């Protein structure tokens, strides 16, 4: 039997294929946000060695004189309200917060009766008084009279004659522990920040150049 073309086509046709539903897989949840822990710097002066007003004024001076204070890892403060026999020069670690205290002298003109307390301050040459305000350390020096020292540049009207007056940080016999034990107080300088000979090498290295020394009364 000969089939017609239409019959042949009908015989070759296949049954329609049922379409399976497409199931979309759920997208994986986004990874949890990783919180970067905030690093809280340690507190400055946890032992509260420095008078709060002195600390706050020194911190302000760092910003006011930022063009000259180029290093902010540590600073040096002098509290002229304290007795000369007490440790009243402070190295403040601005990164770690630690404070180290040293003794330093004031000028004989600031304490003419040698009471151990600085009473008056001046920027005038030949006054032999201490000067207050912000200084920039200017590096290690060497003088014919005082030997190794740290040079200072006065940054304010109250101390901008520091170079002319040769106001420096230097070692002195009258700042040594033996003098203190004998006299009950330190001796007086001509306005310099005199320190014990044993403290000077470390201070000379660490003060360097471009750090703040701030004296206040």
Which residues fall in each region the model found?
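Soluble or luminal CAZymes and related metallo-dependent hydrolases
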Residues: 195
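N-terminal export signals
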Residues: 1-19
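Short cysteine clusters
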Residues: 192
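C-terminal functional extensions of proteins
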Residues: 210-217
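Cell wall/extracellular polymer interaction/catalysis modules
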Residues: 19-189, 198-205, 211
């Amino acid at each position: 039997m000969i089939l017609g073309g239409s019959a042949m086509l009908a015989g070759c046709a296949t049954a329609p294929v049922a379409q399976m539903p497409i199931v979309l897989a759920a997208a994986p949840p986004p990874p949890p946000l990783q919180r970067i822990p905030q690093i809280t710097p340690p507190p400055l002066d946890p032992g509260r060695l420095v008078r709060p007003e002195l600390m706050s004024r020194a911190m302000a001076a760092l910003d006011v004189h930022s063009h000259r204070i180029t290093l902010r890892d540590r600073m040096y403060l002098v509290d002229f309200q304290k007795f000369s026999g007490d440790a009243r020069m402070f190295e403040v670690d601005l990164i770690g917060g630690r404070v180290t205290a040293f003794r330093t002298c004031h000028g004989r003109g600031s304490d003419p009766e040698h009471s151990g307390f600085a009473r008056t301050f001046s920027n005038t040459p030949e006054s032999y008084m201490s000067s207050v305000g912000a200084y920039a350390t200017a590096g290690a020096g060497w003088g014919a009279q005082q030997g190794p020292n740290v040079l200072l540049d006065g940054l304010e009207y109250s101390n901008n004659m520091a170079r002319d007056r040769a106001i420096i940080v230097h070692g002195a016999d009258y700042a040594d522990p033996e003098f203190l034990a004998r006299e009950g107080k330190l001796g007086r300088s001509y306005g310099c920040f005199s320190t014990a000979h044993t403290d000077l090498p470390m201070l000379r290295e660490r003060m360097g150049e471009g750090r703040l020394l701030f004296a206040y009364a």
